[in-house]
């Protein structure tokens, strides 16, 4: 079947527009001529993916960043197609790319040419939209509420010359400096509720978010489980003193960081906490999340394929 490329030139605060011509040449050299479909705004990648997958295009190659990939995943799933997904990183964050060992555009093109397919989990989430309406969406990397979602809201459109990590940390500063937390209540599968005053909670399929923070070092994208990381209420000084733990894989060694695994998660927050999926702000809690095991066919680096 014919492949199609969905390109988001706005990804990475415009960095994708500069990178795309060189990446397009690489694609043509390794895969031959491909039809490129360019997004025009938020949600358009989902619409394009739904239409293309529904009419038989396979694979769909998503060129952009984590948000673009999220939209394309949602489009494939809503189409009912089993089309394969290929990834082309054009933005700086690339947290899901880190989780699967995708090193950059050139490596991504070679991965697409090799064509190794891995069946990976997707997480379906029901939550409250901006107007209070019920919504449903999927993520492949990480959903977070609290600090992570507040930072995702602030970071949109920030200076593209700042690395993804620096943008995220700068966006988190106001919340950390204010020392704000929220009362979180979690239900994991059929267990009794867990309650904490929290700074942030991550529901993880992948391992990285926020431009390289290793928020779920034990997560696997094909184990049928959500890794839940909860950080109790902390302030700026405490985060600064433990910054290395965010990137070293030792985050669970801190006494205020908690880790669980579940197939299904329900969450409430007081006050209602903002929610982001794969780096994109989408609404607020309450939420219900459930793993869809191996629901997506992902073209993956050979070293990570089963």
Locations of the language-model features?
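Glycine-rich beta-strand-to-loop/alpha-helix junction loops that act as flexible
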Residues: 9, 63-65, 88-90
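Catalytic core of DAGKc-family lipid kinases
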Residues: 30, 39, 77-199
């Amino acid at each position: 079947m014919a492949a199609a490329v969905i390109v988001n030139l706005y990804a990475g605060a415009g960095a994708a527009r500069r990178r795309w011509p060189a990446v397009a040449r690489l694609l043509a050299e390794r895969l031959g001529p491909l039809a490129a479909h360019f997004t025009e705004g938020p949600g358009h990648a989902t619409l394009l993916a739904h239409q293309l997958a529904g009419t038989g295009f396979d694979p769909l190659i998503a060129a952009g960043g984590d948000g673009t990939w999220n939209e394309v995943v949602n489009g494939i799933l809503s189409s009912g197609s089993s089309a394969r997904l290929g990834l082309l990183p054009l933005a700086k964050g690339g947290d899901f790319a880190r989780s699967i060992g995708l090193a950059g555009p050139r490596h991504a093109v070679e991965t697409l040419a090799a064509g190794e397919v891995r069946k990976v989990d997707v997480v379906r989430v029901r939550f409250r939209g901006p107007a209070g309406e019920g919504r449903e969406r999927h993520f492949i990397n990480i959903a977070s509420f609290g600090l992570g979602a507040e930072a995702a809201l602030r970071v949109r459109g920030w200076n593209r010359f700042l690395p993804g990590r620096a943008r995220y940390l700068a966006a988190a500063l106001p919340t950390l400096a204010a020392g704000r937390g929220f009362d979180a209540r979690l239900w994991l599968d059929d267990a009794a509720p867990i309650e904490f005053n929290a700074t942030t909670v991550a529901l993880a399929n992948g391992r990285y978010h926020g431009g390289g923070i290793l928020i779920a070092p034990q997560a696997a994208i094909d184990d049928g489980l959500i890794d839940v990381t909860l950080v109790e209420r902390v302030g700026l000084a405490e985060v600064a003193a433990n910054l290395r733990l965010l990137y070293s894989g030792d985050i669970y060694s801190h006494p205020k960081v908690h880790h669980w695994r579940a197939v299904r998660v329900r969450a409430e927050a007081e006050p209602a906490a903002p929610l982001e999926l794969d780096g994109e702000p989408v609404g607020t809690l309450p939420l219900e999340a459930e793993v869809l095991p191996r629901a997506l066919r992902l073209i993956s680096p050979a070293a990570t394929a089963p």
